[in-house]
Amino acid sequence: MVHLTGEEKAAVTALWGKVNVXEVGGEALGRLLVVYPWTQRFFESFGDLSSPDAVMSNXKVKAHGKKVLGAFSDGLAHLDNLKSTFAQLSELHCDKLHVDPENFRLLGNVLVCVLAHHFGKEFTPQVQAAYQKVVAGVANALAHKYH
């Protein structure tokens, strides 16, 4: 559960309504793979990830980034019940994919950077603070099934 004030929730919702999920999702996942290259091991089937340019232009990275942000959008609609919303994804990433749960926090922080880049002055410190709460809540929900 994420505790947001009414003002924070309104700010998150208003900005998210302007987000191009395909563009921001692809960029966020791409940046995760470039900035934290050890995360690439989970995406070996995506083809060429040999350079930052290759990662950022990889169609499979972009498509999966869009999928990730689609799930994030679902989370925004269920901020009061994130553990339930992400239960299946948590189980998949824990039991089948064996993803280090720290990667969820890293991706959340990269997403905040990408949003700041895309929205500039509109991404005020107050909006950032609200999004930091949201990405932390999502990361915690995704890590819930880990022992």
From Swiss-Prot:
SUPFAM superfamilies: Globin-like. Pfam families: Globin. The keyword ATP-binding does not apply. Keywords: Acetylation, Heme, Iron, Metal-binding, Oxygen transport, Phosphoprotein, S-nitrosylation, Transport. The keyword Transport applies. Heme b binds at residues 64, 93. GO terms for biological process: hydrogen peroxide catabolic process. The modification S-nitrosocysteine is found at residue 94. One of its GO terms (molecular function) is metal ion binding. The modification Phosphothreonine is found at residue 13. Red blood cells. InterPro entries: Globin, Globin-like_sf, Globin/Proto, Hemoglobin_b, Hemoglobin_oxygen_transport. Residues 3-147 form the Globin domain. The modification Phosphoserine is found at residue 45. GO terms for cellular component: blood microparticle; haptoglobin-hemoglobin complex; hemoglobin complex. The modification N6-acetyllysine is found at residues 60, 83, 145. Heterotetramer of two alpha chains and two beta chains. Belongs to the globin family. Involved in oxygen transport from the lung to the various peripheral tissues. This is Hemoglobin subunit beta.
